[in-house]
Structure formats: structure tokens, C-alpha cells
Amino acid sequence: MDEHPPPPFPTVGIIGKPGDPAIAGLVERLLPMLEARGCTALLDEQSMPETGDDRHPQRVSRETLLDACDLIIAIGGDGTLIHIARAVAGRRDVALMGINRGRLGFLVDIAPEHLDEVAQILDGQHVVDERLLLHAEIRSNEDDTLLREDVAINEVVLHRWNTARMIELVTRIDGEPLSDHRSDGLILATPTGSTAYAMAGGGPIVHPNLHAMLLVPVCPHTLSNRPLVVDGSSRIEIDVHPRFIEHVRVSCDSQNDLTLQAGSRLVVRAHPSPVRLVHPPGYSYFNLLRAKLGWGGPLCNIEPFGA
């Protein structure tokens, strides 16, 4: 008797954007794909509606799902996948893929009408894409004690929050002074985040295969303070002038805030475990940029080449 090889992803979890009525229909279409390939399906009880299907898989807690799955399918926008990526950081080697029910979709790149691409991924036909994560730490200046920590796949932002005044920052990279400047804040971004807040702040687009970090000042008072790209193994430390310490917050992917206090500083470096995304065959980052940023459209009022 022929034995079927084990599926590339034996246990698959599905997490959806809460409150989206279209998710139930997508789940109904995904379940037969998983069943046909011998995959165990787990639904996130926090976000997934009841399907009413006799083949209804287990609805489990978010923690159970994150610990058990080899692949997690995120149904929603980029924010949904970012939330999941932050949650799995450092847990285990779990892959993430996204079905786009949001707007832009830089990370969730499978359209609901193209679920055949999900089938290809489940069959092992996929592009693996490892993305750098940032580890943000609030540390004591006195003895370097870790006070608070979080992770980010897009960016860590030190920003003013309860004042209209600029804040004063001192930045060091690997212990070497970089700048003392006044601004509305500082964006510390991954290559993934280079097409998010950092791009809006005038930073460059950095290919996600590069092991790098971006420093992008937010409205700096001195125009010579420009965006900077540094090696991904760098340790970035930021001190806030004591006069402004109560007026700043540290935001991780705009999903969680850390508070600085007198005598503490922000330390940002690469997380030891990257996020593993999987894309359908033929995935191209440059095609994604063309589609999402409108680079592929015709030039206005210019005859096409060869016309």
C-alpha cells in the first residue's frame, strides 16, 4: 500500500480579523483544502466565528494555537498579521501566511479570490521569506536592569505624546555617539517597516532580505538630521533629556506602548528569531512594490515607448 508523505504543515491554525463577516465563508473554503491534505486545523476561538460544519475543527485558545501550529493563516489586513507575528516571536519555528481582507496588503498578499495559491503553499510550493524583528527594551541607566520589553516587525517609534513641544534625544550606535537632536521623535524600522511609517517620514525603501535597521527622525529641527541605514546587528541606544522624559512614549508597531521613566533609556536591536513568512510560487517583492505603490501605471501625458 502506498503511503502518503506527511504534509509540509501538519497542523494549521486560522486566525481572523474580529468582526469581519466574510471570514466564515473563507474558512468554509479553506477547511476542505486542509482536510484533503491530512492537515489538522485549529481555529482561534478569540476571533473565528462558529462555522456550523460537521467537520468543524477544534476551536482553541490563542495561546494553544500559537504553541501547536506549524503554519498560521491570518485572514485580515497587515495589522492582523503583524499582531500574530509579534505574538509568535521567539516561540517556535512557525510559518505565517496572509489572506488579504484589509486595504493595502504588503504582508497579507493572497487575495480571497485566489485561494488556489493557499493550496499550492499547503502542497509545499512556496517562497520562504524571513523578516527581521526588532527587540525594544527599556533599561535602567544605573545598572542596566531590564524594566520593560516588546517586539516589532515594522518599527519601534519613540515619540512625543502629550505636548506640542519637540523633544531632545541622544542616540548612540554600538556605544558610539551618533547625534544629539531635537525632533518630534525617532522611527527605528526594519526593512519590512521601510514601506510603512518610515517611508512617510522620508526614509528609503529597503529590501526585506537585507539585515539592516533604519533610523528616521520625525520632523527634525535641524535639516542635516537625515535618515540612516545601519547594520542589523547594531545596538541602538536612545536617551531622552530629563526635561522631556514624561512627554514621550515608545510604540511598537502601533499596537503596544512602553513608558520611559527618569533614569531609563531605550535600547533597540534585532530579535534573535526572525519571522518566517510563506508566499505563493512566483512571489516577487518588486512586483509587490509596483502594485501597491502604483509604479506600474502609465506615465501621464507621455506617449508609451515604441508608440
UniProtKB/Swiss-Prot annotation:
GO terms for molecular function: ATP binding; metal ion binding; NAD binding; NAD+ kinase activity. Its EC number is 2.7.1.23. Keywords: ATP-binding, Cytoplasm, Kinase, NAD, NADP, Nucleotide-binding, Transferase. It is an enzyme of class 2 (transferase). The keyword Protease does not apply. GO terms for biological process: NAD metabolic process; NADP biosynthetic process. It holds the Pfam family NAD_kinase. It comes from the Bacteria. Its cofactor is a divalent metal cation. The active site is at 78 (proton acceptor). Transmembrane segments: none annotated. One of its GO terms (cellular component) is cytoplasm. It catalyses: NAD(+) + ATP = ADP + NADP(+) + H(+). PANTHER family: NAD KINASE. HAMAP family: NAD_kinase. Belongs to the NAD kinase family. This is NAD kinase. It comes from Halorhodospira halophila (strain DSM 244 / SL1) (Ectothiorhodospira halophila (strain DSM 244 / SL1)).
